[in-house]
């Protein structure tokens, strides 16, 4: 019988029954660059840590199991993972990419990969006729779902059908949902990307990235690339992610429950003109999420009545931190215009719906009463200042 995902976050089934070093329950950190050989032509299975390291190998097997893939690759950051994946493509290849992506991905595609001869079509994969953009040289479709930061939801099965009809690789960045809530490979994707810095590690204390695949041809190419480029994750960082993953399930559930309540509270505030959270029934992707995921996650985006109100929130929050990142135990609020999407041209940001009054929340695991209490205080202070010191 298949094991539940909470169990898979803690136990690697294939290792059970084997005696770990001294019976240690915490997987060891093999902090070594190289390995001694018993004799010429003989190896312990590890030769040099750029090629592979026992701690990294254990982590990769754990992440592959969580995403139901045949292999995973642990890299030094989420952007390192995307950069390595782009090495699968050659000059002249064409990739269809969603227009609403993390700003770092957009920067990589248009400032680095295009310079190297890869062509991109940036479209709204939720609404545009994706198939009409497929050309003779198209090799892949690249999506996030939900997207960063506008929380658009793409039908993964629909994208997988298009990819298969045209022999394309479907790549899904699953960072916002984590393997706990969504498994794109099970829905027809070929490759899954994660910024392991976010929910997988979950404590804002390390950088990591992952590529997971269920295709042997892609697995073979990626194993060669990680060996050749030297982008593998260091042993101590691997251990930090392993430790964080053990509590993935309870963190995701608590964060999601908090996000639902905060979204509902924000909907009642007159200064908030829009709350974008897939868990709300009025979200355009709500029904798709119910079909392809086991939850709605803990990311949400809001539009405020003005830039001034948005900036005032950023200045006044204290327990909620104004910081760039997501997926940790702390609740963070981010200003996409100057942070995650600062390098995206203004006209593209605005076309995607990102304005100077847009804020993105990564909801953490604090007591919900404390989170809503702080937001209530912050909103009240701003309203009072707007009214010249008079309470509204």
Enumerate the predicted regions with their spans.
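Glycine-rich beta-alpha junction loops
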Residues: 14-16, 31-37, 176, 198, ...
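Conserved PLP-enzyme active-site core in the AAT-like
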Residues: 1, 17-18, 72-271, 276, ...
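A common structural junction motif
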Residues: 229-230, 317-327, 378-387
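Positively charged, small/polar-rich N-terminal and surface patches that mediate targeting and assembly
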Residues: 2-6, 16, 54, 274, ...
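Conserved N-terminal alpha-helix of the aminotransferase class I/II PLP-enzyme fold
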Residues: 34-83, 87-88, 104-111
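Conserved C-terminal alpha-helix-loop-beta "cap" of PLP-dependent enzymes
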Residues: 274-359, 363
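PLP-dependent enzyme catalytic core of the Aspartate aminotransferase-like
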Residues: 103, 119-121, 251, 308, ...
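N-terminal "arm"/small-domain region of PLP-dependent enzymes with the aminotransferase-like
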Residues: 1-53, 59-62
């Amino acid at each position: 019988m298949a094991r539940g995902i909470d169990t898979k976050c803690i136990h690697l089934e294939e290792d059970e029954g084997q005696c770990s070093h001294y019976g240690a329950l915490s997987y060891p950190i093999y902090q070594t660059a190289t390995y001694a050989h018993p004799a010429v032509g003989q190896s312990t299975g590890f030769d040099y840590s750029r090629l592979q390291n026992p701690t990294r190998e254990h982590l990769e097997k754990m992440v592959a199991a969580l995403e139901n893939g045949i292999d995973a690759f642990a890299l030094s950051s989420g952007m390192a993972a995307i950069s390595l994946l782009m090495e699968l493509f050659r000059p002249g290849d064409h990739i269809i990419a969603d227009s609403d992506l993390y700003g770092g991905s957009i920067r990589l595609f248009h400032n680095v990969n295009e310079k190297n001869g890869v062509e991109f079509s940036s479209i709204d994969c939720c609404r545009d006729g994706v198939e009409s953009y497929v050309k003779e040289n198209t090799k892949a479709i690249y999506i996030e779902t939900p997207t960063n930061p506008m929380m658009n939801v793409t039908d993964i099965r629909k994208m997988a059908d298009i990819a298969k009809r045209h022999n394309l690789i479907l790549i899904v960045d699953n960072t916002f949902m984590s393997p706990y809530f969504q498994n794109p490979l099970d829905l027809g994707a070929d490759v899954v990307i994660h910024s392991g810095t976010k929910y997988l590690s979950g404590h804002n204390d390390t950088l990591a990235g992952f590529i997971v695949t269920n295709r042997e041809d892609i697995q073979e190419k990626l194993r060669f690339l990680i060996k050749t480029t030297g982008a593998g994750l260091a042993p101590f960082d691997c251990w930090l992610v392993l430790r964080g993953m053990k509590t993935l399930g309870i963190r995701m559930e608590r964060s999601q429950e908090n996000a639902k309540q905060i979204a509902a509270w924000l909907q009642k505030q007159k200064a908030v003109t829009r709350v974008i959270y897939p868990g709300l029934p009025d979200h355009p992707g709500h029904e798709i999420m119910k079909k392809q995921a086991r939850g709605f996650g803990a990311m949400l985006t809001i539009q405020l009545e003005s830039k001034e109100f948005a900036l005032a929130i950023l200045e006044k929050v204290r327990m909620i931190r104004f910081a760039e990142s997501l997926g940790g135990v702390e609740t963070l609020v981010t200003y996409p215009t100057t942070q995650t999407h600062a390098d995206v041209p203004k006209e593209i940001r605005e076309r995607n719906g990102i304005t100077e009054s847009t804020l993105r929340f990564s909801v953490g695991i604090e007591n919900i009463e404390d989170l809503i209490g702080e937001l209530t205080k912050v909103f009240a202070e701003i309203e009072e200042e707007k009214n010249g010191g008079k309470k509204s």
